[in-house]
Design a protein with these regions (language model features):
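FIC/Doc superfamily catalytic core
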Residues: 1-190, 194-273
Length: 273
């Protein structure tokens, strides 16, 4: 079954490239806006793709929507722009790199936390010094004392694997596994999901792959796949979910392009009777 899905994805990818969809003016910019909108929406932002476009291009805020939702989107945009630049130089994934990315996306919404383990600033990408759980009665993440060593280990694994991943599927699945493992370690008090999705896309940028979007309407399935992996200590549910998201992303982009090409232009003039 998995092999069949990846064959479909490769065919869609070839079609996407053949149609020259990403060559359209500002395509990358607006697709990035969509990535950002869906990533923050998974964390509770109420901004739509149109809201985000107006915010980024015109500086216009969405009436009646919380300021923090605008700040989340602005900060994540800066983090993605940094990731795009760093991917051009294939900057290695290190703990310092991950802290920089988290600091960028938590720049205006993070704060200083004083806990039993000490004080840390979540706006500067500092690792948590306290325990965290996934909501009331939810999954408890690893002890904060173990976080630095586990992040070091993850970065070493990713650096080594990036040199060896040769096939289309291997490259994508490396990015998906990076996402899963970082969010499972949960190094920060906030912004773990956004940073994990950014890391996934960063690896895809490094390989010049189409960046995978996780759709806000699939949030529940996304969270369930992560929990299943964490409970059963297997990556398969998440890899299957992400393959589905990639297929969905490519299919929608191709369909939108085809619809736009079929539209017939008609002159529009006001008729005065």
């Amino acid at each position: 079954m998995e092999q069949g899905v990846w064959q479909e994805i490769e065919l869609l990818y070839q079609k996407f490239q053949k149609l020259g969809i990403s060559e359209a003016v500002d395509y990358d910019k607006y697709y990035l806006y969509s990535l950002i909108t869906h990533s923050t929406a998974i964390e509770g932002s109420t901004l739509t793709e149109l809201d985000t476009q107006l915010l980024f291009d015109e500086g216009v805020t969405a009436k009646g929507k919380p300021l923090v939702h605008h700040l989340m989107n602005e900060d994540l945009k800066q983090a993605y722009e940094l990731a795009k630049v760093e991917s051009d130089s294939l900057v290695p994934i290190t703990p310092a790199f991950l802290k920089r990315m988290n600091a960028m996306l938590m720049r205006t919404t993070g704060s200083v936390h004083s806990v039993m383990g000490g004080s840390f600033d979540s706006s500067k990408g500092e690792f948590r010094l306290c325990g965290v759980t996934a909501g009331v009665g939810g999954h408890s993440y690893m002890n904060y004392l173990k976080v630095p060593a586990k992040v070091d280990e993850l970065c070493a694994i990713l650096q080594e694997k990036q040199k060896k991943m040769g096939t289309f599927r291997e490259q994508y699945e490396l990015s998906f596994n990076a996402h899963l493992n970082l969010v499972t370690i949960h190094p920060w008090v906030d912004g773990n999901g956004r940073t994990a999705r950014l890391l996934m896309n960063y690896i895809q940028f490094c390989y010049h792959l189409f960046p995978t979007k996780i759709f806000k309407e699939d949030r529940e399935e996304y969270i369930l796949s992560l929990r299943q992996c964490q409970d059963e200590e297997t990556n398969q549910p998440f890899l299957s979910f992400m393959a589905g998201q990639l297929k969905k992303s490519l299919s929608l982009e191709i369909e939108r392009f085809k619809v736009s090409q079929k539209k017939v232009f008609s002159f529009m003039f006001l008729s005065i009777i």
